[in-house]
Amino acid sequence: MDFIKELKDLGIELNDIQLEQFKKYYELLVEYNKVMNLTGITDIEMVYLKHFYDSLTLVKAYDFTKDISLCDVGSGAGFPSIPLKIAFPNIKVVIVDSLNKRIEFLKIVVKELNLTNVELIHARAEEFDKKESFDVVTSRALANINIGLELCMPLVKVNGYYLPMVVSYDLGNNVIKELGGELISEIKFYLPIENSERKILKVRKVSKTKDKYPRSFSQIKKNPLK
């Protein structure tokens, strides 16, 4: 894949420093994956396509050239927030993940790539007490979109956006409404090379989420909103 060309088609142009940051990120991912099991994808072309490029397709849903705060819930090895931070150094990023080994890996990434304004939080999303704090909240490949909505919507500022990246989903609009949001659009596209389908939902926060949300994760999982 011609990473530079494909990003230009998204309206993203990287300088030499940013390209070097992506190269270093790839090297760290492969190195630490041997002991941490961070990803099942290690081939360089596939990492650039399915992790780096895929993360940056969020520009289809939002203008990241603005000075905004972004919270990435369940980021794993840093997707989509670290690629977004490399491409848009102006954004302030908070990453929340429940697995400490992933947070430790991301500390190394942030240090080695000289990234600033990145905060790494080891916590479960439902226990992360920053309601109505972020312009944008992202999540990638959460198994159940309704669970993702309950975990993430409380974190979004009124007039901010939740941008879940999904492959498929079964969504009731009443769930979005119950959590203070409205579905603005579904953005559907295909990854280059393999033509696999991707979807980004653009959910705007129109009113404050009720204080009772999010519930405990056991309650969320046992009885997800419908």
Give the role of each language-model region.
Residues 56-141, 149:
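Conserved SAM/SAH cofactor-binding pocket of Class I
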Residues 29, 84, 203:
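Residue-level signal for inorganic ion chemistry
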Residues 88, 156-158:
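Helix-to-beta-strand junctions that scaffold the AdoMet/dcAdoMet cofactor pocket
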Residues 175-226:
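SAM/dcSAM-binding transferase cores
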Residues 1-65, 71, 101-118, 216-217:
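Class I SAM-dependent transferase core
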